[in-house]
Amino acid sequence: MHKILIRNNYKPLVGKIKINGSKNAVLPIMAASLLSSSPVILHNVPDLIDVHLMSKLLESLGAEVNFMHNKNYKANHTLKIDCSNINNHVMPYKTASKLRTSFLILGPMLSRFGKARTAFPGGCNIGKRPVDMHIKALEEMGAKIEIDGYNIIATVKGKLQGKEITFEKISVGATENVIMAATFAEGVTTINNAATEPEVLDLIDFLKKMGADIEIDNTKVVITGVEALNGCVHKIIPDRIEAGTYALAAIITGGKLELEGINLSDIRCITNELETIGAMVELYDGGIVISRKNGSIKSANVATDPYPNFPSDMQPQLMSAMCIADGISVIEENIFENRFTHADELRKLGANISIEKSKATISGIKSLSGANLYATDLRSTAALVLASLVAGGETIINNSHHLWRGYEAMHEKLNSCGADISISS
């Protein structure tokens, strides 16, 4: 069981942090590589547990995957994927069940090979993540989908058929799955109420480089099926959630961090909210410098919603900041039903948090105290790390392996800016 030990040395974090490629962009793009009969090369790939799990899934299907580390520093790695010799359509349960985005392999496998078998997707334990929208849309396109225990078996006779699909609510995963499924479908597929997150747009950009015919107009995506896709070279967009997490580290500790390698337009939905709680954000080409204005952190009322609104993946980290803010803050979680598991652990540090259904009310206090904590998922672990930076004494975070699913070398990056964090197994 991995543990993180954080000692509060009462130092504001000061320095520069390089932002990695986006976890939420690279995983669907890796799945989309199944659509190409020639190699793809991905740059700016983060070295994460989930990336290696997806690599194992692709290899289990017959792909050749080569992860090339950048030896100079922990960022900008390269991934080469060759799916020209796919010889299997069954994903191993042990691997697929650990990874939520394993379900995204269904669309490209159905589209190119007409069959796929996978397990119900795993990942973080943050409530229901229904795959019903994925299944319904694929069935509308002509797929036959059977559920056998924990397994999902999908087949199609001939080609998938282009259809007009309207999602009842915006879903990033369902949008991505249908886009990939539609690339080889017969005719035109139109998705209404599609997700338009930067990560979805990065997937579309990747597919178009390979030869896909995709047009997007606001929340409407139109895909005209093609006969084949070719490999390409693509650079993964920066991780806006990683950037937002480190931005909050600067605010919480009263420090000043330069975050290098950011798409400014992508992170605006985060920095706009941070400015309301007292952040000073200086923009430059490809990065930001973030610090806290004079005084305490301000309270806020925040709701998570699909892009371009405040992302659910930043909600736990923001809650950590609200624990030491002036006044009372309210956070409403509108994406996932069980994404307040970190609240119990923050209370162990002394935080004053009450939960009622999808709303958390946080009454800010002057200081937190170290404790023995247990992480439950990726973003909650990041939230506990942030809170522990300013908790008096020492804090131990158990089950910290979740962190490496979405953050490469977080402890090293924070330590380089003045934190005192160590890792043990």
Swiss-Prot record:
UniProt main location, coarse: cytoplasm
Record's keyword terms, sorted: Cell cycle, Cell division, Cell shape, Cell wall biogenesis/degradation, Cytoplasm, Peptidoglycan synthesis, Pyruvate, Transferase
2-(S-cysteinyl)pyruvic acid O-phosphothioketal: residues bearing it: C124
Organism of derivation: Wolbachia sp. subsp. Drosophila simulans (strain wRi)
Family indicated by similarity: Belongs to the EPSP synthase family. MurA subfamily.
E.C. no: 2.5.1.7
Protein name per Swiss-Prot or TrEMBL: UDP-N-acetylglucosamine 1-carboxyvinyltransferase
Residue sites binding phosphoenolpyruvate per the record: K23, N24
Pathways per UniProt: Cell wall biogenesis; peptidoglycan biosynthesis
GO terms of biological process kind: cell division; cell wall organization; peptidoglycan biosynthetic process; regulation of cell shape; UDP-N-acetylgalactosamine biosynthetic process
Function per UniProt: Cell wall formation. Adds enolpyruvyl to UDP-N-acetylglucosamine.
Catalytic reaction(s) noted: phosphoenolpyruvate + UDP-N-acetyl-alpha-D-glucosamine = UDP-N-acetyl-3-O-(1-carboxyvinyl)-alpha-D-glucosamine + phosphate
Gene3D superfamilies attached to this UniProt entry: Enolpyruvate transferase domain
Residues binding UDP-N-acetyl-alpha-D-glucosamine, per UniProt: R100, D313, I335
Molecular function terms, GO-annotated: UDP-N-acetylglucosamine 1-carboxyvinyltransferase activity
InterPro entries: Enolpyruvate_Tfrase_dom, Enolpyruvate_Tfrase_sf, MurA_subfamily, RNA3'P_cycl/enolpyr_Trfase_a/b, UDP_GlcNAc_COvinyl_MurA
One GO term describing the cellular component: cytoplasm
Subcellular location: Cytoplasm
Active site, UniProt feature: C124 (proton donor)
